[in-house]
Amino acid sequence: MKWLFLLAALLLAGCVSAGPAGGSLDSIARDYVKLQLAIGEKEEGYIDAYYGPPKWQAEAKTAPGTPAALAQRAGVLAVRLSSLADGRLDPIERRRRDFLLAQLKAASTRLAMMQGAKLAFADEAEGLFGVRPELKPLSAYDPILARIERLVPGAGPLADRVDAFQERFTIPRERLEPVMRAAIAECRRRTAEHIALPANERFTLEFVTGKSWGGYNWYKGDANSLIQVNTDLPIRIDRAVDLGCHEGYPGHHVYNALLEQKLARARGWVEFTVYPLYSPQSFIAEGSANYGIDLAFPGDDQLAFETRTLYPLAGLPAARAPQFLALHRAMQDLAGARFTIAADYLDGRIGRARAVELTRKYQLYSAVRAEKSVAFIDQYRSYVINYGLGMDYVRAYVESFGEAPERRWAAMESLLSGPTLPSDLVVP
């Protein structure tokens, strides 16, 4: 693949122009953080979170360097890391080194893209997130559509029927905040029963508009998050628990808080004070956040909580709640279709209008929601694999520890608290 040769060339250039090679993991980690901050000056949104020394951020703003120069710096750091032989490192240090190498590969890939490299969707996903997605033909999802047809019978296009059914479960705007806060509180309660959260952890909830995403966690450091919920489109009641777990507990908020507590603070690993969005770390973040919903609400727990608490708060009748949740779960099996649509669209095999049309058919979205979904692909590209594929990886790993809830939660906490890479989740 052409991009691999490009990365090799960047590494070679780094070797030729390198300063001192080797060094300790701590010194390499400091240079890594400064490099990531400098890359962040070249692309808005590249840095998802930073809570390290303000001085380093100021330095990056003053003299970030060109993408080519930053690529050379990434190559130098990769060489320095590779010079640290296994025999010199204990097991946790080897994991730390491997994590840094994987993050640097992603940074080099993104820098290559900034310089005009055109990568195929699967190559881009592998370069940025450390996993090569399987892209099934869309026809592979037709049996799932047939199953959903039986859940929502009637005339007209299936996407229209699904959307009309789901609209009955829209949370009124004036009731949205109490519903969301109740959902987040329950997600937190269930998580705290199994994971010891930092004593000062907290979040702020905001409602926003004008975004391509539905929810976002902006981690501020000191166990503090800003959770934003986008209200461009009506929010259905199933999204309350989904967002509460995904953005909060045991999702992004808990993941970032544990990394800060266990690695950045307790071990002094400064590389965890910066979170580059386009990196294997996002595969872990999105996958664990999505799986965290099922972990926190196993079996019929979500349905019971929603009908007991959320439906009354939203002022919605709960008579058809079981059918609504069954539809929601069936539609999750269509997640992989989004990868195929994104790949065909970004690789130029279909145009935008066709991508919207296929999103309507294979994600069962209204026209407006399909447009929003493709807008997300426009902005974040191969990042879309992290949700469904990441969840599959995390689920397989956590559930390999057995059916006992305490064992699954312990596996989840370990996953969230360490320098975990996608390759660590591969179950033999």
Residue ranges and their predicted role:
Residues 15-428:
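N-terminal maturation segment of proteins
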Residues 5-14:
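Bacterial N-terminal signal peptides
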